Design a protein with these regions (language model features):
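Short loop/turn segments that flank or connect secondary-structure elements
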Residues: 1-152
Length: 152
């Protein structure tokens, strides 16, 4: 995991603002608020930054290619779209110095679907196989840990 993070640091944001204009989650805004209330740090940060689009169609009209890419990986009723209201007309954050970790760390996972123009796509392609392998190993270890605990 440290190797993946180290490689990420060799890339920098090109300020395309795609991550601010169209964020997605498998959770509705209400579900995110509930998760945040229950202590989920990611959800708390997410709802502190993003607000929901009024519909999938609105997001689709604004960013058809990215929405299409995301919808290929999720069922329609499992994906919600959001945007950051702090994005200025120049495509830059109006509160950049005070942005939360969710913004500072994006993308923190090479398994997320990134817009084609995102400068981190090259990093994603470079480390995705390693990330998938690590994810599979974690699942395998978890499975065997469960089996061992059942025997004990």
């Amino acid at each position: 995991i440290q190797i993946i993070e180290k490689r990420r640091q060799t890339y920098s944001c090109a300020c395309c603002s795609s991550c601010c204009k169209l964020a997605s989650s498998e959770y509705s805004f209400e579900e995110l608020k509930q998760r945040a209330k229950n202590g989920d740090v990611f959800s708390k940060e997410f709802i502190s930054v993003f607000v929901p689009y009024d519909s999938v169609d609105t997001a689709q009209k604004l960013y058809p290619d990215y929405v299409k890419l995301l919808r290929e990986h999720f069922k329609d009723n499992e994906l919600y779209f959001y945007y950051c209201p702090k994005l200025g007309s120049n495509g830059l954050c109006t509160d950049y110095e005070n942005r939360p970790n969710i913004c500072r760390d994006f993308p923190n996972n090479p398994l997320v679907a990134l817009p084609l123009k995102c400068s981190y796509n090259e990093w994603k392609q470079e480390v995705e196989i390693t990330a998938l392998t690590l994810h599979a190993l974690i699942d395998i270890i978890g499975y065997y840990k469960q089996k061992i605990n059942e025997v004990l």
